[in-house]
Structures are given as C-alpha cells and as structure tokens.
C-alpha cells in the first residue's frame, strides 16, 4: 500500500466499488478499502433490486442472482393479498441477489479497472489541512498507517463516521432510522418467483416484513421498522413471532441485523476533498429502505465528478458541490416524493390498510400510479380521504 493516491474510497459496498471503478476508469490512482476481511459479508439487506436499474450499471450474471422475480404480493394485516406485476412493484423487485458474490464482483471490477483493493483495512480518522480533507489515518491488519489523497469518498454505510469527521451532519432522527433484522431460512413454503410483503402493527409497526426467495424452499425473511415505533420489543423479537406463525417448520441458517436511513438525502453530500455515497449520504429509498441501485448511481456520479475536479486541479468544496447537484438531479425528486409518502403511510392504521386492500381487489394495476391507486381507494371508501390525503 502506498502513502499517496488520487482517491481513497472508504467502504467496498456497491456505492464505494462503483465510485472506485469509475474513478479508476478515468485514469485516477484509486485505493478502495474495506474494514471487514471479506467484501460482501455479512449481508445486511434483503438483496432485492429492480432489473432495469441494475442493468444501467452491470450486466446481470447468473452466478450472483438467486431468484428471478415476476411479481410482488402485499398482504394487509388481515391477510388480504394485493398482487403487483414486477413492473409495478418498485425498485426492489426484479432480481434477488447473492450479495456476498455480487459485492465481490463489483470490487473485482474496480480492481480490473486499476483500483487497489485492501480488506481488513479501516479508516480511523481524516487528515484535514486548512479546512480541506486530504487523506486518512487508518489501521491495516492492526498496523497504523497514513495515506494522503486529493479526494476521500465516504462509502462506509449508515453508521458512517467519515462524513462526521469532515464536519457534515449525518445525524438521523428516530423516525428516520429503520432497524432491520433478517433470517436466511430454508424448508419453508414460498412462491419462488414472488417477493412478499406483510404489513401491520402485529409483526412490524412502522414498517413491513419481507420474504424474498433465494432458491428452492429458501428465502430471506426479514423486517424493517422505524425506531420511533418500538413498543418494548426489538425487531428480531417481532421477526421470531412472524416466523413462528408463518414458517413454524422452517430452519434458520443465518441471522443479520442492521439499520437503514429512511430520511431522504442529506442536505450536504460533499465538502472540500470529500464526498459521501450510498447509505453514508442517506440516498436509500425512504419507503422500502432499499439502497443498492441508488448507491451505485451515487458512486458512479462521484467517480466522474471527482475525475473532472482532479483534472481541473480544483477539489474545493465549491468544485465538489457539483456532485451534490448531480445526485440531487438524478435521485432527489424520487427520494423527496417517497419520503412524503413514508410520512403518511407509517401513520396509517391497520384498519385503513385492510379496507384499502379490500378496495383494490379486482383492480387492473397495469400503468397505475400511486396517486391513481389512492384515488381508487378513496372513491370506493370516502371515509379514508383524511388518512390518505397526503398521498394524492
């Protein structure tokens, strides 16, 4: 490992690897570091992505695809099912990935593009001179090191420290943190080409349960719920209750827990010598918590902007603010809209969910928007107007 680079990327998730790959393809000297000894492990998400979104960045490869999804089924609290086509189901429905392989493949692409990749290497601080970030301090296999860089990319996830070290406020309100728990399960009866979602306060107050197929009788079974909706139980306790009810004969192969920002994008994504990508910049979807595609989008934008700024010899806060503008242009409208929807949906009662699900029986969902769906529900049930008006 050298003592100086053009770019140092902290975190080898999808956003970090895309930033490293893109910058390296532009001829920059890039270091990509990952604090864990294995990239992609442990898995900390449901692993669902939309096909169109994924294909913007990489050609799908069967070796890292666990399931090809054709539809989504949403179950209201009373068990009423609404089925959506893959097209209508959203950005997290299309493929279920094998993240342990997928993340490593992205890092491998970065390496093939010319980036240096180091695992078991952790950033412990930033080098800041005259208010400008110009490198990191860290530990590699227990040994301390210092490495300078023209730009540092913070891709260290929702628990990101790098942005805070640079003076960017990354604090999340309780209502904007989704705590997640997930079991990888086998010996369960599932629909192999459907991603299933369960709503309601019994299993996931302020959130939802997901069942994402991973193969024959195998699935990621997890839930995410807002920290502000805890009722004296940890999410994993709710998850155990769901599994006991729905999959009593199933076997748990793996357990993971984590957190996802559902706040919408940070107001500030960069400063002199530093940018934030992926969950570090809170670009995950406020409704679903899904963030793989948005992370890759922000990473690619970061790599291109950084290359332009370095070529121009200007990596100041003003120059790098172009990154903020481009990410906001690409993702901001969708994230802002979905945050508003989240704020309404998390206040909707179980009864309203049930009535809405009943109202949607027999509806043709082809080319239907959220607004049209809500109008259909309200037309059939005028009493729900007050509760759902924020979605129209």
UniProtKB/Swiss-Prot annotation:
Q: Which Pfam families match?
A: FAD_binding_2, GGR_cat
Cofactors demanded by this protein: FAD
* Gene Ontology MF annotations: flavin adenine dinucleotide binding; geranylgeranyl reductase activity; oxidoreductase activity, acting on the CH-CH group of donors, iron-sulfur protein as acceptor; oxidoreductase activity, acting on the CH-CH group of donors, NAD or NADP as acceptor
Which residue pairs form cystines in this protein?
none
Q: Give the cofactor note text.
A: Binds 1 FAD per subunit.
Binding of a 2,3-bis-O-(geranylgeranyl)-sn-glycerol 1-phospholipid occurs at 370
Keyword list, A-Z = FAD, Flavoprotein, Lipid biosynthesis, Lipid metabolism, Oxidoreductase, Phospholipid biosynthesis, Phospholipid metabolism
Task: Give the domain of life.
Answer: Archaea
Record's GO cellular component terms: membrane
Annotated GO biological processes are: glycerophospholipid biosynthetic process; membrane lipid biosynthetic process
Looking up NCBIfam families in the UniProt record yields: GG-red-SF
Per the record, the similarity remark reads: Belongs to the geranylgeranyl reductase family. DGGGPL reductase subfamily.
Name the job this protein performs: Is involved in the reduction of 2,3-digeranylgeranylglycerophospholipids (unsaturated archaeols) into 2,3-diphytanylglycerophospholipids (saturated archaeols) in the biosynthesis of archaeal membrane lipids. Catalyzes the formation of archaetidic acid (2,3-di-O-phytanyl-sn-glyceryl phosphate) from 2,3-di-O-geranylgeranylglyceryl phosphate (DGGGP) via the hydrogenation of each double bond of the isoprenoid chains.
Q: Additional info?
A: Reduction reaction proceeds via syn addition of hydrogen for double bonds.
The protein depicted here goes by the name Digeranylgeranylglycerophospholipid reductase
């Amino acid at each position: 490992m050298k003592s100086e680079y053009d770019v140092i990327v902290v975190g080898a998730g999808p956003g970090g690897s895309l930033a490293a790959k893109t910058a390296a393809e532009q001829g920059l000297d890039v270091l990509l570091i990952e604090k864990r000894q294995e990239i992609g492990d442990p898995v900390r998400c449901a692993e669902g992505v939309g096909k169109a979104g994924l294909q913007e960045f990489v050609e799908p490869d069967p070796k890292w695809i666990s399931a090809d999804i054709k539809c989504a089924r949403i179950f209201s609290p009373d068990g009423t099912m609404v089925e959506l086509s893959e097209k209508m189901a959203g950005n997290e429905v299309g493929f279920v990935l094998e993240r342990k392989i997928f993340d490593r493949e992205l890092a491998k692409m970065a390496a093939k593009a010319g980036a240096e990749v180091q695992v078991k290497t952790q950033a412990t601080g930033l080098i800041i001179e005259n208010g400008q970030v110009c490198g990191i301090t860290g530990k590699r296999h227990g040994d301390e090191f210092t490495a300078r860089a023209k730009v540092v990319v913070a891709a260290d996830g929702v628990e990101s420290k790098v942005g805070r070290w640079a003076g960017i406020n990354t604090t999340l309100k309780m209502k904007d943190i989704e705590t997640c728990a997930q079991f990888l399960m086998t010996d369960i009866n599932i629909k192999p080409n459907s991603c299933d979602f369960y709503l309601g306060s019994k299993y996931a107050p302020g959130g939802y349960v997901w069942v994402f197929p991973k193969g024959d009788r195998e699935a990621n079974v997890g839930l995410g719920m807002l920290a502000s909706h805890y009722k004296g139980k940890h999410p994993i306790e709710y998850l155990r209750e769901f599994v006991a009810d729905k999959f009593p004969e199933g076997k748990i192969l793996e357990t993971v827990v984590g957190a996802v920002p559902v706040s919408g994008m940070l107001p500030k994504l960069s400063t002199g010598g530093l940018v934030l990508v992926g969950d570090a910049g809170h670009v995950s979807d406020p409704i679903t918590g899904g963030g793989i595609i948005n992370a890759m989008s922000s990473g690619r934008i970061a790599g291109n902007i950084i290359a332009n700024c370095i070529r121009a010899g200007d990596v100041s806060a003003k120059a790098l603010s172009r990154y903020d503008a481009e990410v906001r242009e690409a993702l901001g409208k969708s994230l802002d809209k979905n945050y508003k929807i989240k704020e309404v949906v998390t206040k909707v009662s179980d009864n309203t969910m049930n009535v809405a699900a009943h109202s949607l029986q027999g509806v043709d969902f082809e080319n239907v928007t959220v607004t049209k769906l809500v109008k259909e529900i309200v037309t059939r049930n005028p009493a729900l107007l007050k509760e759902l008006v924020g979605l129209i």
